[in-house]
């Protein structure tokens, strides 16, 4: 146990280590990209604004600022719904600093389709909490972003999803493992409804909880896959970074 603790401590100190695994896969004729991250080996963070207080808006501006700071972008994805000024719609924490409060009430659109949830990155766990559970448990999150709806909650699909829904878009989201050590970021590369998208997490990845990030504007960056999606400006960004050698 002592050796394991020392090993994990050393891993955390080393920002050059990454277990990030990105790949292409298929679920029921739907092509999707998945990036799997590991809490103790991947430097996973949330980003919103640059050092001048301006929203990054895209992966290129984030890459440039990271490069100027001696860091490299390995993976990135839009991470939660946002307003026209690119500010988060819901709860947002960056480097332990709360930028936006939790929104627990129902509302319009996918965000307000309760239950919605919060993706939390802490020092010893990565987890998706249903919003009311989050308020009850008050976990200590270094980073957090609220979005909605929950795709999968306690291994069950959101009750309002319809299998035959014709509302089909490119979509993206995140799921977390039962041991709270792994996060799975998924972007569908074909249009699909929320029911099918949620089943990628439930039936293919077998995760107990998954959260919808967005549709229409879904984007992913992967150095490993040489994938860099462009398009409309985005708000919060989740990313894996490492220090340059």
PLM-predicted stretches and their roles:
Residues 17-110:
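Zymogen propeptides
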Residues 19-33, 37, 42, 126, ...:
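Flexible, D/E/H-enriched segments
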Residues 38-41, 120-125, 153-155, 176-181, ...:
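Short acidic-glycine loop/turn motifs at beta-strand connectors
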Residues 49-54, 133-137, 187-191:
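Short, solvent-exposed aromatic-acidic interface loops
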Residues 89-105, 160-172, 176-178, 182-209, ...:
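Conserved, well-ordered active-site substructure
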């Amino acid at each position: 146990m002592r050796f394991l603790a020392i090993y994990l401590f050393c891993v955390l100190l080393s920002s050059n280590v990454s277990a990030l695994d990105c790949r292409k896969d298929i679920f029921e004729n739907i092509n999707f990209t998945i990036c799997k991250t590991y809490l103790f080996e991947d430097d996973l963070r949330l980003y919103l604004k640059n050092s001048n207080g301006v929203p990054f808006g895209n992966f290129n501006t984030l890459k440039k600022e990271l490069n100027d700071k001696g860091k490299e972008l390995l993976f990135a994805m839009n991470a939660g719904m946002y307003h026209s000024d690119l500010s988060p719609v819901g709860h947002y924490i960056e480097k332990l600093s709360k930028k936006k409060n939790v929104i627990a009430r129902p509302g319009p659109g996918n965000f307000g389709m309760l239950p919605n949830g919060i993706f939390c990155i802490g020092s010893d766990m990565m987890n998706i909490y249903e919003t009311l559970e989050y308020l009850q448990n008050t976990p200590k999150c270094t980073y957090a972003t609220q979005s909605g709806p929950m795709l999968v909650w306690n291994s069950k699909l959101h009750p309002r999803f319809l299998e035959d829904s014709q509302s089909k878009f490119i979509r993206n989201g995140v799921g977390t493992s039962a041991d709270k050590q792994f996060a799975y970021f998924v972007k569908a590369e074909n249009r699909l409804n929320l029911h099918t998208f949620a089943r990628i997490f439930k039936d293919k990845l077998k995760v107990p909880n998954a959260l919808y990030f967005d549709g229409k504007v879904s984007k992913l960056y992967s150095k490993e896959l040489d994938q860099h999606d462009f398009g409309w400006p985005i708000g919060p960004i989740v990313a894996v970074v490492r220090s340059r050698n």
